[in-house]
């Protein structure tokens, strides 16, 4: 600091370059670290403890293998004058470099060394008044650990974008070194908190063989193919060397250090919250259930969860948990005081009308505008056929006949309804039939494989026609189906039989939603892209800059899921009907996963909901015009596609440049052959030899990470927080006329219905979880936003991104206007709950949509 003052007084500043570093508060970022407050007094602590060295992009050091010349060390320090105002939780430090432009050239990278005893989070370093360059920005967004933790220098490049062939020669070795460090091929693990290694592994850490609770290894075999997850390098279990040992709940599972949220993200809150549920609230719920009859008896009993709450018994574990968790994170999390009142906010589905969920209209509307609107397909043949192998399952053709449905076809015959695109099906029959014998052998589980036929009315709403409930029936070597068809009824016991039939459908749909639409098709399939991008694409690569925001926190939330949610005996197995067979079932589904069908237009065409239409902006035409998920989603898809197309065209003027991009080709090869290696021989993989292939792939990746995940995640509590609307488990069969159970249904239909679906314990546990998982954080970064305005120096890219953001804001207005249109009946429905899950929320720059809002498309899968 005194040296800087001397230079000012003597005028010796000709070779000085001023810089400004932005650091994040440790106290804000890591509430568990009680030394963090000491670090936040940056003026007292830092002094000479953080040093910086500029690296030339234009002048090579021939004594250092032609690498860019490295300048002398400069210290971060508090400035003499008042610094510009900073955002909450940020600290700004100045730095002054001795750098002769005519001798050292243009700075293109910066080396940071942390000589302090603990880590800090560096956001950016900006050089001001650089001769010939004006401003140079180094974007870090990285945890910097003490220098002894690394066997290499931490280096950050200026925010320019370079294809590998365009990288300044003096910086090329640094670029290659950095990728080699991230690949960590020479490091087997177990990896530590400070490590930055991205490697692959199979899902071999879900079970605990040493405690007689094994689960099959998913990935790496024909029997159980699966996407890869991030490697932790933990030691194998004693009983099964192919399974990885697990950590205790409170231990932090490894993810590369910069994948751990450097912000008070909702995924951080989720980590504490889920552990609070498992360690504190879950035992309290068990005790409560043991001390009471253990069941809800009426819908009114369930509604008490949202009115007065439940008084849980005093559990010592809750007090111990309260002491161990950061105060900021538990204010609204753990029940407080001697009464331990557990109360939930009222879900949107029952806010305006507590019984609308029971109607056929709302049941059908949610198939188009609910939690799982990506399963319905157009029926093209009648009766519906099965795709199951007839040599194993016999003839599984539906038993629904024209007599079951023609009275509700508004004067049409079945063939006429088919020909006019008026028949649709929610078909879970083939999804679950192969697994029902195992599933129904679990304690407390009895469910069906369901088919639901629907008719498209003139006003574009759907009308349920029939529900087929099927069970496996073993005949010799065949597992055929034993089925019964139920049709709508509006009064008497028949209406409650119909209500139960819809509940069995909802159970199927809930399981498929959580297991496939949500976990497999967003969380699991995205992780290989995250790993491959960090291993093969430099941070200076334009495709890295395009995709990186859509990976934020994904590895972290997936690691948390493996630790507490999808593991053997975890919350998922306890609350969703496939139980311990759930993940193995998702592996069977993954066998038929196809990356090229994950984009919305291709998905809609595959399901017969849309046809190709070159004249349409989205190139498809919907056959159900009022299909909120698809209507909004196509607008989002088109905006993403236009943005990606404009962006990629800046860097790839022709296919030859793309084909010669060694990093891009290595990235795509690794995605296919390693990350999704169990499907590497599929013929649908794009060859990545043309610009359209790249733009389609990147558009699909961004779609999955943002809009698709938002559609299946942030409506969980609003739609399913009231379990009768979306039960996750069924526990007994449909009662047969003349049976004791049929009499029970007739005498007390509410009680029978509630005792058939998810139990009291499972309900409270499940609702506790999805309340957490449905929340947005105050610092959520939505589609069309970036966490760092200086993410690139390229003005063409910045202008294209502004156009993208403006287009998303325009979509917001269109969504709100459609929700006000009384002719679009599927937008709001009988429950008076508008569909906003595909509302981008790009216009929200202040975190106004914090909490459970049922709107907003975050950039990434972070919860």
From Swiss-Prot:
Give a GO molecular function annotation for the protein.
oxidoreductase activity, acting on single donors with incorporation of molecular oxygen, incorporation of two atoms of oxygen
Which positions are tagged coiled coil? Answer: none
Q: In terms of domain of life, where is this protein from?
A: Eukaryota
Q: Where is this region: Disordered?
A: 204-244
Which Gene Ontology BP terms does the record give?
fatty acid biosynthetic process; lipid oxidation; oxylipin biosynthetic process
EC number(s): the record gives 1.13.11.58
* Reactions this protein catalyses: (9Z,12Z)-octadecadienoate + O2 = (9S)-hydroperoxy-(10E,12Z)-octadecadienoate
Task performed by this protein: Plant lipoxygenase may be involved in a number of diverse aspects of plant physiology including growth and development, pest resistance, and senescence or responses to wounding.
Protein name according to UniProt: Linoleate 9S-lipoxygenase 1
Q: Which taxonomic lineage is given here? A: Eukaryota, Viridiplantae, Streptophyta, Embryophyta, Tracheophyta
